[in-house]
Amino acid sequence: MNSPNESDGMPGREPSLEILPRTPLHSIPVAVEVKPVLPGAMPSSMGGGGGGSPSPVELRGALAGPMDPALREQQLQQELLVLKQQQQLQKQLLFAEFQKQHDHLTRQHEVQLQKHLKQQQEMLAAKRQQELEQQRQREQQRQEELEKQRLEQQLLILRNKEKSKESAIASTEVKLRLQEFLLSKSKEPTPGSLNHSLPQHPKCWGAHHASLDQSSPPQSGPPGTPPSYKLPLLGPYDSRDDFPLRKTASEPNLKVRSRLKQKVAERRSSPLLRRKDGTVISTFKKRAVEITGTGPGVSSVCNSAPGSGPSSPNSSHSAIAENGFTGSVPNIPTEMLPQHRALPLDSSPNQFSLYTSPSLPNISLGLQATVTVTNSHLTASPKLSTQQEAERQALQSLRQGGTLTGKFMSTSSIPGCLLGVTLEGDTSPHGHASLLQHVLLLEQARQQSTLIAVPLHGQSPLVTGERVATSMRTVGKLPRHRPLSRTQSSPLPQSPQALQQLVMQQQHQQFLEKQKQQQMQLGKILTKTGELPRQPTTHPEETEEELTEQQEALLGEGALTMPREGSTESESTQEDLEEEEDEEEEDEDCIQVKDEEGESGPDEGPDLEESSAGYKKLFTDAQQLQPLQVYQAPLSLATVPHQALGRTQSSPAAPGSMKSPPDQPTKHLFTTGVVYDTFMLKHQCMCGNTHVHPEHAGRIQSIWSRLQETGLLSKCERIRGRKATLDEIQTVHSEYHTLLYGTSPLNRQKLDSKKLLGPISQKMYAMLPCGGIGVDSDTVWNEMHSSSAVRMAVGCLVELAFKVAAGELKNGFAIIRPPGHHAEESTAMGFCFFNSVAITAKLLQQKLNVGKVLIVDWDIHHGNGTQQAFYDDPSVLYISLHRYDNGNFFPGSGAPEEVGGGPGMGYNVNVAWTGGVDPPIGDVEYLTAFRTVVMPIAHEFSPDVVLVSAGFDAVEGHLSPLGGYSVTARCFGHLTRQLMTLAGGRVVLALEGGHDLTAICDASEACVSALLSVELQPLDEAVLQQKPSINAVATLEKVIEIQSKHWSCVQRFATGLGCSLQEAQAGETEEAETVSAMALLSVGAEQAQAVATQEHSPRPAEEPMEQEPTL
């Protein structure tokens, strides 16, 4: 019995728990064993061995006496309770451990799963990349195979081609002819060898062909060089340039062409410098230099720099001056004079080193379109003794080759650039032009024979025209040369008079260039008042501060002008303009000139190429804006021919340096004008998220699309917008504010530096939560585009309002953004930077002398900026209908008591709705306000122009922070119709607020329909029968009470504010009938009183009677 007692004295209870299951519950030892476990069995002070001594006594006492069954039952219950608690605790520990292990395993499984998925994705990506690479390789192989097959097919076609077709591979016939050509070069003809027939001469092979690409072997010199200018054998080919001997006419190797032209351009130098071989310029050449000028700019009408290469076409003059060749007069047959034949072969090889390949266009050599003649009509003339015989032979050859439509003229005073006569009977559009040029030069040389006594060298640039008279030559030996195309040159003048004429032309051309610069500056001012209907463009317009953007606009956007659909005016479309430009490019921009008999032919254009080159350059910009119209220009022999082109001046920005018909301003149809420009779309937050910003570019895009879809836009006149100038903006805003928001980093440097000192150079913007910048949390700013966009919005409205006020348009609707009626003199707020409506009203008064302007602002927010601009101005009446709520709605201004100040007292009317949106203000309230306040005051004011700040955020669909009212879009159409009864219908609406796209599109459609006098949908019957809300009636009563002191017309509407529209209309009708009846009664009473007065008046004693007229 001691062991159980000792166990009871131990602090742990595990032994007793283990014994319980083995011992029957009804046995006495169980009671003995469990008793110490009970909470109240032993005092807590007992412990250790000291507490064990009295236990046997108690146990023996318990065993001695009978145990109470109730107490034993209670003990058992307590034991069971403790047992359950122990088991529950063990379960909790076990569950906690299980949950811990489960979470650990779950995390391990997730990590393993993620790792596995990552590996799978990497494998898939690698596999996809491999597949793409294989696909790319297969595609590349397929392309290579196709290219190889194409080349093989081309080679096969070339091998099997007919001999008459072109080929880049030299055929046997070409090689044989080249060999014959080289052999003929080794045998120089003697001066007396005049018996060469034309078909046998190596230079006459071109006569068998009719195009540039079919011209045969090259000559030793440039095409058409006379025999006296023949080069030493292989002279050019032994030079340092190492030019290839020949290329076939159809050679497609563009790289070789570019390399050859590059070498030629590198070797070209000023025509006035000494030759590299040290050859002294002849006396005649020095005289030519004195006549033509001292600079390279005189060498070409196009003012091309010498040696500018293939990208800068030079005239024939510059070609000869640079190269020493006479390429402009290729068909003058001359003999080799003794002094020229004595030239050593090695004396000046570099003088003729400019190789001219028949396959290259060689812009600086020869006429634009001289073609060869069929080799059947020109025969050799073995004997030629006098100059007259040479001229006779020339005329005979012309008669054989073709008939002249005009008589042969003496051309001593005609510059070569004006020669052009139509040849009949020639299949080529430029046939026999070279022969005609030759005959005219013969006649000219005969009259200028005093200049031929000077010893001449082969490289003299002016030798050709004067040597003709003294050389013994034959027309039958005229050398043939290949025709040149895509050239910008003209024949070289062959007389001092012609050279002086050329100098005059170039001086006049420089004068025209200066005039062009002046016209561009003048065009900036004229464009502001010019009228050119167009489709909206995406480019900045002309402003004083952005000259670079102006030029880009002229080149990039001016061509986007579109005629208004349904317009009765005849305006060329963009397709027509492109067709005209294509035709001009095909004709080489030649001017068509009528001859004396009134007949024009295709040969006249090339002869005027030099004079037209300057015009083409002059009208490059304007050509994209306006259609070209060619006028007849007389062939004037005494004046400079600079009066050939005239343009339809549909825009004042076109260059006006030439005499042309007077400008006719574009006449707009008397209808509704609409202005819109896509440049305003660039004003957006830099974050690019339009969902965060209610005022975004989609607003005006949606309205423009809606007007297009409904067909309303086609009935309107589309007006071309522009940017407002800084001076125009400063009519309302301060200079600091204007420079702050009206300039961008691009044009800010052009302004006066003194204006940028101070806060502007250190301007700071607020960082928005979206990542962009802005003036406040709503008014975003884009440093690069916002300044131009806000100025474009102002300028568009100004242009439209000016046209309406001037009577050119009936009315107008401006689809512009950002809005402006919150912008004050020096403050930007509420999405607004510049107050477009206020600026427009100021400019109307200042520039068009408009007397009185009415501004109606039905945006749900008060136009605090507009009110501030005209608060003391009696010439501008400002009426605003807005949500006020006792100053608790943005911007908090616009109380009914704000009626103006100073001389403008009473010219500020605020219909300030109060009471919140319970119930919301709707159609009935707005129509009642117009009936009782707006229209009576407006009629009494009698404005000259009505401007409307057309904000549509009161339309149903806008939430309470940005609106909350329930006005329908149809209602705004009826309000617009009422305003059209003012100012003779001169009403201009400018978009302000409104951010629900559907709502603003519906409202804009309704307003444009009203402006176009399209029948509007009638108001619902419920609206006509509904009475205004109590809050609205209270607001209107307060407004009438305040404004009746300044406008007596509103006093009579104070009693009928609570009536419905039907009741009000019935009352007005009855009142009108009563007034009419009273007026009739008063008129009748006056008439009766007048009759009675007349009856009672005494009759004169002697009233003369009418006498009969004497017969």
From Swiss-Prot:
Cross-link Glycyl lysine isopeptide (Lys-Gly) (interchain with G-Cter in SUMO2): residue positions: K35
Subcellular location: Nucleus; Cytoplasm
Posttranslational modification: Phosphorylated by AMPK, CaMK1, SIK1 and PRKD1 at Ser-250 and Ser-489. The phosphorylation is required for the export to the cytoplasm and inhibition. Phosphorylated by the PKC kinases PKN1 and PKN2, impairing nuclear import. Phosphorylated by GRK5, leading to nuclear export of HDAC5 and allowing MEF2-mediated transcription. Ubiquitinated. Polyubiquitination however does not lead to its degradation.
GO terms, molecular function: histone deacetylase activity, hydrolytic mechanism; metal ion binding
Chain span(s) of sequence motif Nuclear export signal: 1070-1109
Chief location bin: nucleus
Region (Histone deacetylase): 671-1017
Catalytic activity: N(6)-acetyl-L-lysyl-[histone] + H2O = L-lysyl-[histone] + acetate
Residues that bind Zn(2+): C685, C687, H693, C770
Sorted UniProt keywords: Acetylation, Chromatin regulator, Cytoplasm, Hydrolase, Isopeptide bond, Metal-binding, Nucleus, Phosphoprotein, Repressor, Transcription, Transcription regulation, Ubl conjugation, Zinc
GO biological process, one term: negative regulation of transcription by RNA polymerase II
Acidic residues composition-biased segments: 572-610
Annotated catalytic residues: H822
Pfam families on file: HDAC4_Gln (PF12203), Hist_deacetyl (PF00850)
Start-end of Basic and acidic residues biased regions: 238-249, 263-272
E.C. number(s) listed in UniProt: 3.5.1.98
Residues bearing the modification Phosphoserine: S250, S489, S600, S650, S1097
Biased segments, Low complexity type: 485-495
UniProt modified residues of type N6-acetyllysine: K524
Quaternary state and interactors: Interacts with AHRR, BAHD1, BCOR, HDAC7, HDAC9, CTBP1, MEF2C, NCOR2, NRIP1, PHB2 and a 14-3-3 chaperone protein. Interacts with BCL6, DDIT3/CHOP, GRK5, KDM5B and MYOCD. Interacts with EP300 in the presence of TFAP2C. Interacts with ANKRA2. Interacts with CUL7 (as part of the 3M complex); negatively regulated by ANKRA2. Interacts with ZBTB7B; the interaction allows the recruitment of HDAC4 on CD8 loci for deacetylation and possible inhibition of CD8 genes expression. Interacts with RARA.
Job of this protein: Responsible for the deacetylation of lysine residues on the N-terminal part of the core histones (H2A, H2B, H3 and H4). Histone deacetylation gives a tag for epigenetic repression and plays an important role in transcriptional regulation, cell cycle progression and developmental events. Histone deacetylases act via the formation of large multiprotein complexes. Involved in muscle maturation by repressing transcription of myocyte enhancer MEF2C. During muscle differentiation, it shuttles into the cytoplasm, allowing the expression of myocyte enhancer factors.
Entry domain remark: The nuclear export sequence mediates the shuttling between the nucleus and the cytoplasm.
Family: Belongs to the histone deacetylase family. HD type 2 subfamily.
Name of the protein: Histone deacetylase 5
Protein's organism: Cricetulus griseus
